[in-house]
Amino acid sequence: MAKDIKFSEEARRSMLRGVDALADAVKVTLGPKGRNVVLEKKFGSPLITNDGVTIAKEIELEDAFENMGAKLVAEVASKTNDVAGDGTTTATVLAQAMIREGLKNVTAGANPVGVRKGIEQAVAVAVESLKEISKPIEGKESIAQVASISAADEEVGSLIAEAMERVGNDGVITIEESKGFTTELEVVEGMQFDRGYASPYMVTDSDKMEAVLENPYILVTDKKITNIQEILPVLEQVVQQGKPLLLIAEDVEGEALATLVVNKLRGTFNAVAVKAPGFGDRRKAMLEDISILTGAEVITEDLGLDLKSTQINQLGRASKVVVTKENTTIVEGAGDTEQIAARVNQIRAQVEETTSEFDKEKLQERLAKLAGGVAVIKVGAATETELKERKLRIEDALNSTRAAVEEGIVSGGGTALVNVYNKVAALEAEGDELTGINIVLRALEEPIRQIAHNAGLEGSVIVERLKNEEIGVGYNAATGEWVNMIDKGIVDPTKVTRSALQNAASVAAMFLTTEAVVADKPEENKGGAGMPDMGGMGGMGGMM
């Protein structure tokens, strides 16, 4: 396919038009008085959102060169979202400001490489200054404040704070759509995995169709059990103790399953058989997790262990097990706390090392199951459109809160970026490097300018006053007051602000050093591919 090539000034100008198109659509959503953007969906109702990355991903421009500019800025939003989970609109605003200012200077004759060096120096100092003014997040109230600001909803803030308190900072918090109108929190204590009983005859509560085992023994094996003789010796030992048994195996079928069911129905012995969770290597890892949590040994030929010679001291214990048709929940496993802690640290290390998003998600699920439990926020709304928008906001708020727990918080509302202004301005440089530093200085003001603009105010007045205020004091655009931002709970996670600045600078530096842009030439539609003209089928009149 033929290519279209543009060079230097012409190339950068074309891309800038794309940058502006995307950034102008995204930045109207910034701040407490930000507006919404409506996105057309080919199927179903349109999506109304104020989430920067969602808007950025939807934008596709007709002109190939403009589209490349738009995609560069969309990458800033996407990368910030991946790293910090929020701050995508701020990142987009920063990137647009740096690219615009940079392009003015490069057009006027500045050397892009020198400008890039200045930008990198300024951002490094700004990031260090952000870390210095960052405060650690402590207590449920602080967590609720961060979540409330991100979701623009105090109810959501308190729900997320409660969820994190219940399952711990590493716990899995999932967000699901609810059938009702209200948004609720449901917490599953202990370890839950998605495998239910092997036979419905094993239930102890026929109304709820669930089997509840109090203080059971737990047998964990990776074998398929078909013959009752294999597990008879250990069954007899458990019967003597008068306790129920949870049997986790690759599968339990045939005579073995029938015998367990018959004994349950006769009231002789209560046992519930469950298939092992996961597949392949993940199954092996999850069985080990269960064994460590309950204090069991995994009966596997890999370790030279045989079911027939299994003793009762090789089984695990738990205070309670609840098995439904689809899930098994083990509450208060009797495993050694030191071994559980070591396993948690091992999984944490694997999370840090893995590059696969899927593997990371699965490892974090395992981590949560060992470390505390799973919380589910069930999102409710009156209409499907409102439900989608609300779910997106809650996801952002959750990511934002996790980022705050990780690296602390700074003053929100664009205040923190202006707070580091003086440190960056104190940098000594000359020539094009100084130009690069000045570009970053101008960009640091842009988020607060945009927040003020969205609230119907003059940004320059707010920025100039903010530079003279003490660190932490800022403008609350929601109420129109000057307040101590952290005291009032108007905060941003340091990680979000840092990531937005670093990613914006990275793309701006690449943009300014671009000297040629190559795109596919649009194909001309010659109209020759269709059916030949048949003259309105008039020539076929003789066939009547």
Curated annotation (Swiss-Prot):
Forms a cylinder of 14 subunits composed of two heptameric rings stacked back-to-back. Interacts with the co-chaperonin GroES. It is found in: Cytoplasm. InterPro entries: Chaperonin_Cpn60_CS, Cpn60/GroEL, Cpn60/GroEL/TCP-1, GroEL-like_apical_dom_sf, GROEL-like_equatorial_sf, TCP-1-like_intermed_sf. HAMAP family: CH60. Keywords: ATP-binding, Chaperone, Cytoplasm, Isomerase, Nucleotide-binding. This is Chaperonin GroEL. The lineage of its organism: Bacteria, Bacillati, Bacillota, Bacilli, Bacillales. Belongs to the chaperonin (HSP60) family. One of its GO terms (cellular component) is cytoplasm. It catalyses: ATP + H2O + a folded polypeptide = ADP + phosphate + an unfolded polypeptide. Its main location: cytoplasm. It comes from the Bacteria. Its EC number is 5.6.1.7. SUPFAM superfamilies: GroEL apical domain-like, GroEL equatorial domain-like, GroEL-intermediate domain like. ATP binds at T29, L30, G31, P32, D86, G87, T88, T89, T90, G413, N476, A477, A478, D492. GO terms for molecular function: ATP binding; ATP-dependent protein folding chaperone; isomerase activity; unfolded protein binding. Together with its co-chaperonin GroES, plays an essential role in assisting protein folding. The GroEL-GroES system forms a nano-cage that allows encapsulation of the non-native substrate proteins and provides a physical environment optimized to promote and accelerate protein folding. It is an enzyme of class 5 (isomerase). GO terms for biological process: protein refolding.
